[in-house]
């Protein structure tokens, strides 16, 4: 099937909870070999301990902001499954920024966590994908990289200054890497999401129950999506069904980013 990922090997970061965990579990259920990476070893063990180290799923704990940890993750994946076909950069952090405080370090932290980690891992994995494809015949796909972004990349909320900058940077990285890797038959795409019940959104709604109604009211489809709906978009971009798609940022937000907050006409 064009959308099948059976037999493919994927690295999924941010796999200890939320969207990353949903991607990892669903990919494994649909026949992919999955290396689940996260710095939260305790949570990885709690979520995956019963199935890891057997069958088609493994987990790797480490701080991917460190270059050596990235190299070790790639090596561990090759040791376990021989090849790498798919990378899903789902590791992300949401942090508020004080736009008027020059001592605030959230922008630097979020650029390092949400952008630079994804870039460095993509570079390492792409090198492995290129090496693998050198020994193959034909002009089939060499690999697919999917970055998880946010509609915050195109919205202006001062309290999310750092997160928005990092998300916008991730999308530009996606486009630039898509051009750099296209000659090697590696596709690079992103999914920008909003109005999806991620771990961070669930936590926020728990603290502010009134936000659920506000989100649903201001989302044209009048609901919050399940993580599975986002996973399906990621699988599409990982599969051969999207074989001619690269450099794209797919928006999965129920139409939320299409709305103008001002109802009065502009002219």
Question: Which residue stretches match the model-derived regions?
Answer:
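Conserved NAD(P)H cofactor-binding loop of Rossmann-fold oxidoreductase domains
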Residues: 90-96, 255
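Short C-terminal tail/terminal secondary-structure segment
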Residues: 235, 246-267
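Active-site helix of classical SDR
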Residues: 122, 166, 174
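Alpha-helical segment proximal to the catalytic Tyr-Lys
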Residues: 127, 179-183, 243
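Substrate-binding pocket helix/loop in short-chain dehydrogenase/reductase
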Residues: 98-111, 215
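Residue(s) in the substrate-gating loop at a strand-loop-helix junction
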Residues: 150
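Conserved glycine-rich Rossmann-like NAD(P)H-binding loop of the short-chain dehydrogenase/reductase
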Residues: 30-46
């Amino acid at each position: 099937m064009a959308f099948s990922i059976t037999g493919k090997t994927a690295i999924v970061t941010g796999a200890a909870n939320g969207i990353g965990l949903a991607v990892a579990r669903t990919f494994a259920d649909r026949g992919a070999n999955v290396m689940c990476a996260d710095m939260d070893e305790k949570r990885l063990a709690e979520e995956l301990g019963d199935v890891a180290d057997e069958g088609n799923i493994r987990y790797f704990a480490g701080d991917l902001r460190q270059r050596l940890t990235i190299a070790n993750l790639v090596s561990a994946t090759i040791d376990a499954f021989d090849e790498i076909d798919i990378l899903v950069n789902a590791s992300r952090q949401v942090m508020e920024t004080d736009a008027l405080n020059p001592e605030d370090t959230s922008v630097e932290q979020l650029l390092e966590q949400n952008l630079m980690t994804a870039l460095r891992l993509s570079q390492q994995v792409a090198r492995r994908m290129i090496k693998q494809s050198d020994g193959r015949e034909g002009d089939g796909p060499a690999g697919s990289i999917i970055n998880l972004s946010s509609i915050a990349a195109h919205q202006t909320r001062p309290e999310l200054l750092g997160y928005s900058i990092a998300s916008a940077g991730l999308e530009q990285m996606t486009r630039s890497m898509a051009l750099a890797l296209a000659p090697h038959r590696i596709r690079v795409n992103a999914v920008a999401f909003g109005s999806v019940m991620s771990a961070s959104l669930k936590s926020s709604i728990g603290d502010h129950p009134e936000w659920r109604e506000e989100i649903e009211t201001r989302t044209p489809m009048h609901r919050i999506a399940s993580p599975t709906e986002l996973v399906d978009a990621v699988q599409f971009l990982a599969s051969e069904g999207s074989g001619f798609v690269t450099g794209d940022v797919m928006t999965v937000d129920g139409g939320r980013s299409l709305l103008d907050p001002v109802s009065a006409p502009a002219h």
